[in-house]
């Protein structure tokens, strides 16, 4: 920041995060397992860094100790791949909730899914992700439930250009859409497009979810437009993509 005041502003919320973790994880090492390796890992620090908003202080009530489980997605899995021959894969798969139905097939280690929640079990009422769905997605014999999974291949001039997708339940669609919009409409690089803060709205509930890194100005504009704001403690989706540009392969998570 170039000044003492600027430096203090830069580190204020980092101090809060450090003390939140202190309250949760530190104690007498003779009787407490202290996760030093996890607390100091690059992945964990990157995760915590997304919470920082240098322009405005984060209220302490909104800060929670970090969650190491978040380093590996507990939800849907997505991967995007391009090989040396130009073959491209965008693949998303899921068992829906964390650990699916919570039932393991004896002797196999295989978890059973709970994809039935993707149906409108009761049309007009929310499912596990808060999505309100109608009769078109009602439970019926032989039907496949509606899914938010969005594995995407983008072609330019008839050739593969981008492979992308994300986990995130109902937030997958908006996460992938915003990433592609950033590239195709706003000329962002793949890295910029992926790391740019995202918003999410799914009609019901009538709230705009915003990531921790969203600018206060953006939030103010949304609120002035009568949007109800829901601040997320984590990213909206976890987009990972591969882009082929001028003979180069670019990947970003």
Where are these regions (language model features)?
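Active-site rim segments in enzyme catalytic domains, especially the processed small/beta chain
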Residues: 88-156, 162, 186, 190
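Single conserved hydrophobic/aromatic residue that forms the stacking wall/gate
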Residues: 1-6, 10-11
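Extended C-terminal subregions enriched in glycine
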Residues: 85, 143, 185-234
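Flexible, glycine/threonine-enriched loop-and-boundary segments that flank and lead into catalytic domains
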Residues: 56-85, 93-98, 133-138
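Short, well-ordered beta-strand elements
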Residues: 3, 79-81, 88-92, 160-167, ...
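Alpha-helical support elements that line or immediately flank enzyme active sites
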Residues: 3, 166-188
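Short Gly/Pro-enriched turn/cap motifs at secondary-structure boundaries
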Residues: 68-72, 137-145, 230-234
């Amino acid at each position: 920041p170039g000044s003492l005041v600027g430096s203090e502003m830069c580190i204020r919320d980092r101090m809060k995060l450090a003390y939140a973790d202190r309250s949760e994880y530190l104690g007498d090492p003779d009787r407490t397992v202290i996760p030093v390796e996890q607390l100091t890992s690059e992945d964990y620090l990157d995760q915590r860094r997304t919470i920082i908003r240098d322009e405005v202080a984060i209220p302490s009530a909104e800060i929670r100790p970090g969650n190491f489980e978040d380093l590996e997605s507990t939800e849907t899995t997505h991967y995007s791949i391009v090989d040396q021959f130009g073959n491209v894969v965008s693949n998303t798969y899921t068992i829906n909730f964390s650990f699916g139905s919570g039932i393991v097939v004896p002797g196999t280690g295989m978890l059973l899914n709970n994809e039935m929640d993707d149906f409108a079990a009761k049309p007009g009422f929310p499912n596990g992700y808060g999505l309100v769905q109608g009769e078109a997605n009602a439970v019926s014999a032989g039907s496949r439930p509606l899914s938010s999974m969005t594995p995407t291949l983008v072609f330019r001039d008839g050739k593969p250009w981008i492979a992308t997708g994300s986990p995130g339940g109902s937030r997958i669609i908006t996460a992938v859409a915003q990433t592609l919009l950033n590239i195709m409409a706003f000329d962002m690089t793949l890295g910029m497009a992926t790391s740019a803060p995202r918003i999410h709205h799914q009609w019901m509930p009538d709230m705009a979810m915003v990531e921790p890194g969203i600018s206060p100005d953006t939030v103010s504009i949304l609120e002035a437009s009568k949007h109800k704001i829901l601040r997320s403690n984590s990213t909206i989706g976890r987009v990972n993509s591969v882009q082929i540009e001028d003979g180069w392969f670019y990947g970003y998570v």
